[in-house]
């Protein structure tokens, strides 16, 4: 089955798969990751060099690190100030990620544009 999604969503997915290729060592998982990565990159090769893609790669790498640190805190049952800061960093960083994806969709003329709406916390 195939489904249409925005260009920003595809580039976001490709950037996450690129991170997984570098972080995950399990050979069975890597087979699936590489298959999905290669399939998506074949469909959108010219977009990988875009500056916004590099921004997504950077922000998704940051999210990966935040989530890893959060899970370690959870594992150790350390729900301290740093845990709270990291938990908040997840949604602050995801908000930035959403802005990048929308910019990609608008700049590249995506037919689909994802919209987000959250309570203003500023």
Regions found by a protein language model. Give the residues of each.
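Extended, charge-rich alpha-helical interface modules
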Residues: 1-122
